[in-house]
């Protein structure tokens, strides 16, 4: 996420290139305004981009409905990351970031 000085798609040593939607960028901007722990978020994104499994505390799981094919993990109890790992093209796609009510209502 080059604008935020932490990640560049296809950075050296990462298994997956990081891509993100315009909505994710807006969600991240809002999270910064809300003083969310973005260091924790970037650590999770880095693990995902490296192909590492997330610890159980992140409650990583598959989604259904509108987000079928995607996964969700908890950065904080009510702060979620919706993403997809596209193994065929080696891409980590970041779709949304927000609370349960922001994402699913």
Give names to the regions the model predicted:
Residues 1-77, 86-92, 97, 101-105:
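Basic, Lys/Arg-enriched alpha-helical interface segments
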